[in-house]
Each structure stands twice: as structure tokens, then as C-alpha cells.
Amino acid sequence: MQHTDDMVQERRGMVELLRRYGIRNSRVLDAFLTVKRHLFVDGESRMFAYHDSALPIGFGQTISQPYTVAYMMELLVENCSSGKVLEIGTGSGFQAAILDALGYRVFTIECVAGLYELASARFEKLGIPVQSRLGDGTLGWPEEAPFDAIIVTAAAPHEPRELMSQLADGGVLILPLGSLASQQMTVIRRKGNRFEHEGFDHFAFVPLLGREGWPDSDE
């Protein structure tokens, strides 16, 4: 099967699939049409870049399936239409690129040095104005706080208090919360010193590592 360099038709097919799966927000769909996912994977994975599947990106990690990213982005847009966003878990850099395409000011943290280096190089090559750093994402980025939204791309065992403290008043934290086997996508909204929780669908993410994540040796 032959592809053009931009893989426009494949990208349109992916967006149509997301629409059939229930993603309705036009901003989110437009962002997925704009960002070239195949530039965030390497080798043979590129031919599957616009399938709705997770793909290996090295270092034992994967790029999330498009539907999962779109689901989180739709929750974000519906709860925080603009502003400053912190992403926990840069991975390939694809979701940060989507956030940028949505018009947010993006900060992202990765704990795996190799992934951080690859993603940073992609951002520079593609001209994506994302601020990235290597470190423990569960501790957030206090020097840049507060954030209008924080997105966590790995399964959290409990509410990460440090991240919650870095939300602006009215800000939202979106994360998969639960066990190692299954997590509920959760939106936590800050209202002054109170935090409101709302649960959505269930997913299966890799575990969140760090001081407020899962221990390295599972449970």
C-alpha cells in the first residue's frame, strides 16, 4: 500500500472513525486532521499510524490509540476552552502537538530520558512551541504553576495532591484513576479550596510512575 508523504487520506479516515466512535467536538476533530501522527512513530509502525491502535515508541512505552487521546481532548475542551496546560507523560509528543493545535499554551513532563530527548527533537524539527522537561511528572511544574488544566497520560492509583495544588482556581485535572488493570477517566475541578470529581468511561493505561504514582515493583 502506497502513501503520500502527508498521508492526508489516511488522516481523514482516522478522523471519520473517531466521529463514528462518538467524538463530536469540531475543534478536536480538526486538530486530529492537522497533526501528522505518522511523524511521531518510527519504522514499520508508520504504516499503522492512522489505525485506532496503540503503537510502540521504544523504551517499553507506547503512543496511545487515537480514540483515547481524542476522548481526553474532548473532555479538556469542554471543561477548559483555552489557557495554560500541563501534560504529564510526554511520550512520543503526539498529544502535546494536539494540545498545541487546539490553541493551548503547552508544558509537558517526561520521566524517561530517551523519550524526552526524542520528543524534544520532534518539537524542534516540527516547530511546535511546547515547553518540555525531564523529571517526575507527579510533582508537576511548580515554577510554572498555576495551570488552567493538567492532563495525566498514565494510570494514577490515587489523586495526585501535588498536581491538584498546581491547578488554578476553576482549573481541571483530567486523569485515569483506579487499579493497574482498569481506570476510570476522571475530571477533577478546582473550586477555591474544594475539588469536585466526575467519572466517565473506563480505560487501561500504563502505570503512572513517580513519588505520587505506583511503585516500580507494581503493588
Curated annotation (Swiss-Prot):
Name the NCBIfam families on file: pimt (TIGR00080), PRK00312.1 (NF001453)
Q: Where in the cell is it found?
A: Cytoplasm
* Role this protein plays: Catalyzes the methyl esterification of L-isoaspartyl residues in peptides and proteins that result from spontaneous decomposition of normal L-aspartyl and L-asparaginyl residues. It plays a role in the repair and/or degradation of damaged proteins.
Q: Does the keyword Magnesium apply?
A: no
> Catalyzes what?
[protein]-L-isoaspartate + S-adenosyl-L-methionine = [protein]-L-isoaspartate alpha-methyl ester + S-adenosyl-L-homocysteine
Give the family per the record.
Belongs to the methyltransferase superfamily. L-isoaspartyl/D-aspartyl protein methyltransferase family.
Biological processes per GO annotation? methylation; protein modification process; protein repair
Q: Give the UniProt entry's GO cellular component terms.
A: cytoplasm
Q: Name one GO molecular function term.
A: protein-L-isoaspartate (D-aspartate) O-methyltransferase activity
User: What is the first-listed, main subcellular location in coarse terms?
Assistant: cytoplasm
Q: What is its EC number?
A: 2.1.1.77
Identify which residues the record assigns to the active site: 64
What is the recorded name of this protein? Protein-L-isoaspartate O-methyltransferase
Keyword annotations of the record: Cytoplasm, Methyltransferase, S-adenosyl-L-methionine, Transferase
